[in-house]
Amino acid sequence: MYWLSRQGLPRKAGMAASLGTAVHASVEDLLLHDISHIKDAESGWLPEFAEGVLKTRWEEEKAIFHATPRRPQWKEDKWKDAVRNQRGAVMMLLDHVGVRSLEQDRITGALWRRIQKLAIAVEGELKTSDGRLMGRLDLLMGDINDEGELVGWLVADLKTGRTPETELKTDVNRQLRMYRDILLANNPSAPNVRTEGWYTQNASKWAAHGENVLEQAYDAWQATVPTPLPMEPTIGDSSCGGFCDWKAWCPHWWNWRNDNGTLHKSDFSDAVVLLQEYDSNTGSAVLELCEPADANGRAMPTGIRQS
């Protein structure tokens, strides 16, 4: 999976990813936009402005989605989810300054400028001094005390996916700690640094705790330097049985599903097919399911047709 991801192959577009990108970009726009024309005590301006910014990003993502050859169907009814996720992000920004429950139509120009000033970095690049490890951090916020003095930094990573039930997933916790540790390595005199996953669906914050992960990250980097030939595959339910952008170029998932009897079994499953008939007027088609003929992924028609 990793080797294929480094070969410059086209990714498959996904509705969840497009929604997440639109929400992320709209929040960044809200934090970076010049609102000097908004008076300090002026309220009622943010909801309409925020939705307009989100709509612009939504349409951008829709255009990119439709220009992607490998894509499912765009779901316009997900717009309401995008609005809810953006509002969740704004609620967490309000929480950062102690007014979480404030109705968003009561946000004043002065309050939003205060939040903007606490945003030290928005969509910033994180990279170790040797250039080997890097990442994109959504927000670096200043932590202040009751006197308004800067006492720390907060790495906040916006998440539009499913909210954790009890704790952060191991990989997400590791990702957030790597952001923290790169930041500390590059800024040895930094104040206290903490990191959180900000889940926009329900505006909940989840702290990442644990030891420094840079040594492990360097070991992983060394082990995954791209090679001319693919690495040994890790075949199993956690890879071949789940979501993967690279199935179109990998024979292993297909053979794995065929061998364990799960090929063509579920309502939502990937398949290799022959297109036997296609009506361009109606979009209807007749497909013939294929099975792997060998370990290299050569397709063998089964005679089973679906329309």
Locations of regions flagged by a protein language model:
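Nuclease catalytic cores
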Residues: M1-I35, E51, W246
